[in-house]
Each structure stands twice: as structure tokens, then as C-alpha cells.
Amino acid sequence: MVVLALHVALYLPGCRSLKDRRRLVRPIVEGARARFRVSAADLGGADRWHRAELGFAVVSGSHAHARDVIDEVERFVWSFPEIEVLETGRTWSEGP
């Protein structure tokens, strides 16, 4: 079993309030959950309306499958024109 986690730091240039931030972040998190069947969460940064950190994770029996799913999730995040991706990072974990 392998777990692959993706961390994404975003800049949200059009946000003027927490409500604006949620309006931009929610479709990304919920869309990734629905389309790719991954765990997805807003990891914080709610005190800074123009920034967001998102986390995504997939559990799989194969490295290749996990990598393919997370590649799709990353492309999905990049497809939102109203955000800027500042940084991404991946973490692998293997279980028994």
C-alpha cells in the first residue's frame, strides 16, 4: 500500500474577504474529491484571504496509479484561471 500526498500553496489575487476565499477554494477541494476520489482539505491560511494551502492524498496498491491520480489532481488545480499556484510538493509513504 502506498500513500501519495500533494501539498499546494495558492495565491488568490481577487479575494477581498473570507467569503471570496471560500468561493474560490471550495470548488477546487470538492471538485477533486468528486472527480478523482481523493482526500482533499483546505489546510489553513484562512487568516490570509489572498493565500490558501490545500492538501490532497490518494491511497493505492501501486506507485504508478497513485502518481497518475495525483498528476490529474495537480492539472485540475492548475486549470483554475482565477488562482495562481505558488508551490507544490509531494510526499510518499509506504505501508505494510
Can you describe what each PLM-predicted range is?
Residues 6-10, 54-56, 88-90:
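A structural signal for short, well-ordered beta-strand segments
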Residues 9, 42-46, 67-72:
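A general secondary-structure boundary signal
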Residues 37-44, 86-87:
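A short linear hydrophobic-aromatic micro-motif
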Residues 41-62, 94:
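Short, charge-patterned binding micro-sites
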Residues 60-96:
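C-terminal structural segments of small proteins and small subunits
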Residues 36, 52, 84:
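Residue-level signal for beta-strand positions within conserved beta-sheet cores that form or flank
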Residues 1-39, 76:
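N-terminal first-folded block
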